Structures are given as structure tokens and as C-alpha cells.
Amino acid sequence: MSGDIHTTAGKIEDLRARLEAAVHAGSERAVEKQHSKGKMTARERINALVDEGSFTEFDELARHRSVSFGMEKDRPYGDGVVIGYGTIDGRQVALFSQDFTVMGGSLGEVFGEKIVKVMDFALKAGIPLIGINDSGGARIQEGVVSLGPYGEIFRRNARSSGVIPQISLILGPCAG
């Protein structure tokens, strides 16, 4: 960022830079590796699924809070999962897409909180939820706090059962 963070223009420039970093959270090498396996990235999958220009993302600037095992040095925006809503053939849906290019798509505390948030949104809005799974499982570096979100996710799966459609796409490794 080259602008003055103490000015409105500088703050806007800083926000734009952060949002751009969130879009490219996975390293170039990780993206190339994903593509070499014939797989799309999380955002590419969303863009291929929803109507063009309809996706609204939330919490793209969320980052993990862990300081164990040197994790404070690697805090990518989005924390490895993209969440939001869009339309498919004009029908509104909520969705999450796990990003294998960011920490192997591993589920940590913030990652799980984001999935829970979009699940709650889908249930409240009464719209289908689509989960695109491509994950290395629990983010073990975060210890037991990475396991708690699984229970919250499963609780919401049960609460949503028979109320809203829940669709899971397994497009890579998946735990659970």
C-alpha cells in the first residue's frame, strides 16, 4: 500500500489491496498444483456454478487467530474457505467452497466459524446450501479448537435437515 492510511483515500486503497490479497490467498505454486490435477480453485468452482456476477462473498478478510507452531507468520485472508450467496438459474443459494490452495483447505476455528455463518444464513433465508468440499481435514496446528467447529457444522446439518436442501460436492479429500 502506498497511500496514507490516515486519509479516506488511503483507507480505500488499503481495503482494495486486502480484498485483492483475499482473492489470491493461495500461492501461485498451490494454484498451479491444483490445476495440474485437473481441479479448479475454490473461487473458480463458485464462478462456474453460480450465475455470472451474482456471487456476494462475506468474511473474505477473516483470518485465523492461532499463534502456535509459527502460524502467526502465515495468516492468509479468507482462512481457506470462501462463503457467500449467489443465484443459479435465477434461484438464490448459499454456498461455501473449501480452498485446497490455502493450507490444504484444512478446517481451523475461523474456517469453521465461516461455514457455520453461511449455514445459519441459508437456514434463516430459507434457501438451499451448497458445500464444495476439498479439504485436508482438521488444521492440527490449531489443536482441539479446530475440532469444535465440526460439531457446530453437524448440529446445523441436523437442524436444516428437511427444512432446506443441503447439497455436498466432494471434489477432493474430505473429512467427515
Model region roles, listed by residue range:
Residues M1-I167, P173-A175:
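Terminal-region recognition feature
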